[in-house]
Design a protein with these regions (language model features):
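Substrate-binding pocket helix/loop in short-chain dehydrogenase/reductase
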Residues: 102-103, 110-115, 206, 210
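Active-site loop immediately N-terminal to the catalytic Tyr-X3-Lys motif
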Residues: 104, 151-157, 179-180, 217, ...
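Residue(s) in the substrate-gating loop at a strand-loop-helix junction
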Residues: 146
Length: 262
C-alpha cells in the first residue's frame, strides 16, 4: 500500500486542547506525518513549549488562544487559522474537561461546565471550521470521544453524557456535511494516562485492577493512537464517515471473566 495514503504533507490541522495530554499526542502524530498545525488552549503561554517541539520536527505550529465556551473565541480561532495558512484541512476536536464526583454530588454548575466544554464547544468549533472546509469542498473532522461514549462509569455521569453526545453528534454531522466533501469521525480512546487522571495512575493497585479488565492487559501508551489519528486525517479514510473508532485495548467489550485467573 502506498505511503501517500497516510502522507499529510501540505495539510493544515487544527488541534484543540493541545497544551497537554491527548492533544499533544495527536498533534505530534500529525506533524510527524507532515502536517502543519494550529494548536489551541485557553492559556496561550502554555502552548509555547509544544510549539517549539513541533518546529523542531520541521513543521510549523501556530499557537492560538481558544475558549470553546465562547462563540467569539471560536470564530476568532477559525479566522486566525484560515489567515495563517489560507486553508484548514483537518480538525482534531479534542478540548475537554472532567469533574469526578458521585452522581448525587454533581451540581448544576458542574454539569454545565462539562457539557458546555465537551459537547456544545465541540459542536460550535466543528461548525466554524466546517464552514471554511465546505467552501473548499474538502475536510477531515475528528471528534474526540472516549470509551465512555459506549460505556458508563460511576463518578463520571456528566462526562459520560457528554462523550455519548459526541458519538451521536459525529453521526449527525457526517450525514449533514458528507455531500460537501467533509468527513466526520470520532476517535474514542480508552484508558490513557493524562493530566486529568494522573492521580489515579499513581495508585498501583488501581492500575493492576484496570489492566486486568483490559483484554490486552495494559493501559494505553501515547503512540498507540498515532496511526489511528493519522488514518482518520489522511486520504486513507476518504470513504469513511460517521464512525466511532475505539482505541481501548478491548475494554469496551465489557467482558466478565468466566474462567479462574491463571
Amino acid at each position: 500500500m502506498s505511503n501517500e495514503l497516510f502522507d499529510l504533507s501540505g495539510r493544515v490541522a487544527i488541534v484543540t486542547g493541545a497544551s497537554r495530554g491527548l492533544g499533544q499526542y495527536f498533534g505530534r502524530a500529525l506533524a510527524k506525518a507532515g502536517a502543519d498545525l494550529v494548536i489551541t488552549s485557553r492559556h496561550l503561554d502554555s502552548l509555547f513549549p509544544f510549539q517549539k517541539e513541533i518546529e523542531e520536527l520541521g513543521r510549523r505550529a501556530v499557537p492560538v488562544e481558544l475558549d470553546v465556551r465562547s462563540a467569539e473565541s471560536i470564530e476568532r480561532m477559525a479566522a486566525l487559522a484560515q489567515e495563517a495558512y489560507g486553508k484548514i484541512d483537518i480538525l482534531v476536536n479534542n478540548a475537554g474537561m472532567n469533574i469526578r464526583k458521585p452522581a448525587l454530588d454533581i451540581t448544576w454548575d458542574d454539569w454545565n461546565a462539562i457539557l458546555d466544554t465537551n459537547l456544545r464547544g465541540s459542536f460550535f468549533v466543528a461548525q466554524a471550521v466546517a464552514r471554511r472546509m465546505i467552501a473548499r469542498g474538502y475536510g477531515r473532522i475528528i471528534n474526540i470521544g472516549s470509551v465512555t461514549s459506549v460505556a458508563g462509569y460511576a463518578g463520571l455521569a456528566p462526562y459520560t453524557a457528554s462523550r455519548g453526545g459526541i458519538r451521536q453528534l459525529t453521526m449527525s454531522l457526517a450525514d449533514d456535511w458528507g455531500k460537501f466533501g467533509v468527513t466526520v469521525n470520532c476517535l474514542a480512546p480508552g484508558w490513557f494516562r493524562t493530566e486529568q487522571n494522573k492521580v489515579m495512575y499513581e495508585d498501583k493497585e488501581w492500575v493492576e485492577y484496570l489492566s486486568d479488565r483490559i483484554p490486552m492487559k495494559r493501559p494505553g501508551k501515547p503512540d498507540d493512537m498515532d496511526s489511528t489519528v493519522v488514518f482518520l486525517a489522511a486520504e486513507s479514510s476518504r470513504y469513511i464517515t460517521g464512525q466511532l473508532l475505539l482505541v481501548d485495548g478491548g475494554i469496551s467489550t465489557g467482558a466478565v471473566r468466566a474462567l479462574p485467573r491463571k
